[in-house]
Swiss-Prot record:
Protein name, per record: S-adenosylmethionine:tRNA ribosyltransferase-isomerase
Keywords from the named record: Cytoplasm, Queuosine biosynthesis, S-adenosyl-L-methionine, Transferase
Subunit structure: Monomer.
Source organism superkingdom: Bacteria
Top-rank EC class of the record's enzyme: transferase
Organism ancestry: Bacteria, Pseudomonadati, Chlorobiota, Chlorobiia, Chlorobiales
EC code: 2.4.99.17
Organism: Chloroherpeton thalassium (strain ATCC 35110 / GB-78)
């Protein structure tokens, strides 16, 4: 398929600047792939679509305040450092983006609040650097929780607010490492999760830390030529065991909460539709046509034009059916992107 197949006009007024309150009060568009039907619900109505024996898979990654501001040694020039991913915990090595990049060279030291100090050890791209934190035996995540800024998405045209630290985080976030929230998970509340569990649905978790490549533009017209950045994942043995059991017994369906869960599961799926457990890095890229091995239902948001997220959802829902419903969503005043409304596809 071509990049132009995923092009549509997204008005600024359709992009949610703030989340729904409460979380599960947002709209929910429900697509039945087999019947080609569309229903309009509220997210809390998601409960009605589960049956006893189904499995709900969450991504328990936690967004950390990845944007730091420091001063360069000697000149005291203000430098923005955006933490992308931890490369080596023992060595204190991180991939980062810096701004202004022209002022940051290999060998420079940057001083942050709370006596945090880093040295630039490599240039990776025009704005990319590898830095080493020089403070021995410190927990970087605990420090950035105090001094960092929450990295809300670039399409939200306002400054981060204190509320974002709580709302740009799922209620089940546990493992720090993401610079982008697993967006579909933002709509769940603890009471809704309990109600789903009480219905006989098993709720399990895996981890995938999404990075800024989520927002990276696809620059090739032939979408098969696009390359994804690698992201860390961990599929626990307990998670794989539950999924493999229901697949073998054909006793329920696998509901993936978001494209991150979908990618982690499909990256670890065998041709027989079983899941391998373990951790590693994945650059799994899903676009039409794609034969899903594990995921039976997908909960997701409304995504940006020409994005890899839209391509994945298009592969799951069937391209023409999905794009028709994106047009309908815009006409029906659905809100799009990170703080916007949701979609269930089964």
């Amino acid at each position: 398929m071509r990049l132009s197949d995923f092009r549509y006009t997204l008005p600024k007024t359709a992009v949610a600047e703030y989340p729904s309150e409460p979380r599960d009060s947002c709209k929910l568009m429900v697509l039945d792939r087999r019947k080609k039907t569309t229903d309009h619900k509220q997210f809390s109505d998601l409960l009605d679509y589960f049956k006893k024996g189904d499995v709900l898979v969450l991504n328990d990654t936690k967004v950390f305040p990845a944007r730091l501001y420091g001063n360069k040694e000697k000149t005291s020039a203000k430098i923005e450092v955006f933490l992308l991913r931890e490369l080596n915990k023992q060595a204190g090595l991180w991939d980062v983006l810096v701004e202004p990049a022209r002022k940051v060279r290999v060998g420079n030291k940057i001083y942050f609040p709370n006596d945090l100090v880093a040295e630039v050890v490599d240039n990776t791209t025009s704005r990319g650097r590898t830095i080493r934190f020089l403070n021995p035996d410190i927990d970087i995540f605990s420090i950035v929780e105090k001094v960092g800024q929450m990295p809300i998405p670039p399409y939200i045209k306002r400054d981060p607010e204190e509320e974002d630290k709580e709302r740009y985080q799922t209620v089940f976030a546990r493992i720090p490492g993401a610079v982008v929230a697993p967006l579909a998970g933002l709509h769940f509340t603890n009471p809704l999760l309990k109600a789903i569990q009480d219905k006989g649905v098993e709720i399990i978790s895996l981890t995938l830390h999404p990075g800024l490549s989520t927002f990276r533009e696809v620059e090739v017209e032939d979408i098969s030529k696009h390359k994804m950045d690698s992201e860390y994942y961990n599929v626990p043995y307990s998670c794989a065991k539950v999924i493999n059991s229901i697949k073998e017994k054909k006793s329920g369906r696998v509901f993936a909460v978001g494209t991150t869960v979908c990618r982690a599961l499909e990256a670890n799926a065998t041709v027989e539709g079983r899941i391998k457990f373990g951790e590693g890095w994945t650059d799994k890229y899903i676009y039409p046509p794609y034969d899903f091995k594990v995921v039976d239902a997908l909960i997701t948001n409304f995504h940006q034009p020409e994005s890899t997220l839209l391509m994945l959802v298009s592969a799951f829902a069937e391209h023409d059916f999905l794009m028709k419903n994106y047009k309908l969503a815009l006409k029906s005043d659905y809100k799009f992107l990170g703080y916007g409304d949701a979609m269930l596809i089964f």
